[in-house]
């Protein structure tokens, strides 16, 4: 059977998939679209503002934290400097006495006569080598011992002649050496006095 091509085609029956929008409501739909676009633009502006506000607050918080940290660090440094200064002052005050006590303990283990001989011999060899004569003023109890120790100092071979004189005002640790150049106190007591004076001078000068 062949189709009848002489007849005009009949248009299909089209039905809407949903309800039709009346022409009177088209304005409402356009307004709704504009409102939606405006809402999206506002949302974008809010996000931009919020991001900028976050960055500002973050920077402010960092700056405040940095300033606070700097202030705290300055306070810590100031306290540390004060503590060091206080400890230094205490040390400067106690160090001389501590040194004296340590030396006294160490030297206390030696015989006073031996220390006196060493001090005198050191002075003669270092400062009076070449002098004609030196006279040692010592405690009477030390005369014989020093006479034996320096019996070889007879004025020959550039060694001064050593003469011993008793002096009851001196302790067994003391000795005053007289020479053509003047006199000088020797012995442990004199050295400890010189050490104390040296500490006192350094303390007064602020160098200790």
Swiss-Prot record:
The keyword Transmembrane is assigned to this record = no
Keyword Plastid among record annotations: no
Name the keywords, alphabetized: Cytoplasm, Nodulation, Plasmid, Protein transport, Transport
- Highest taxon, organism lineage: Bacteria
Q: Which InterPro entries match?
A: T3SS_SctL/SctL2, T3SS_Stator/FliH, T3SS_stator_protein
Compartment(s)? Cytoplasm
| Main localization of the protein described in the UniProt heading | cytoplasm
Q: Name one GO biological process term.
A: protein secretion by the type III secretion system
Please give the GO cellular component terms listed in this UniProt entry: cytosol
| PANTHER family for the chain | FLAGELLAR ASSEMBLY PROTEIN FLIH, YOP PROTEINS TRANSLOCATION PROTEIN L
Quaternary assembly: The core secretion machinery of the T3SS is composed of approximately 20 different proteins, including cytoplasmic components, a base, an export apparatus and a needle. This subunit is part of the cytosolic complex.
Q: Which NCBIfam families match?
A: HrpE_YscL_not
Task: Explain the purpose of this protein.
Answer: Component of the type III secretion system (T3SS), also called injectisome, which is used to inject bacterial effector proteins into eukaryotic host cells. Acts as a regulator of the HrcN/SctN ATPase activity.
Homology family: Belongs to the SctL stator family.
Q: This protein is called what?
A: Type 3 secretion system stator protein
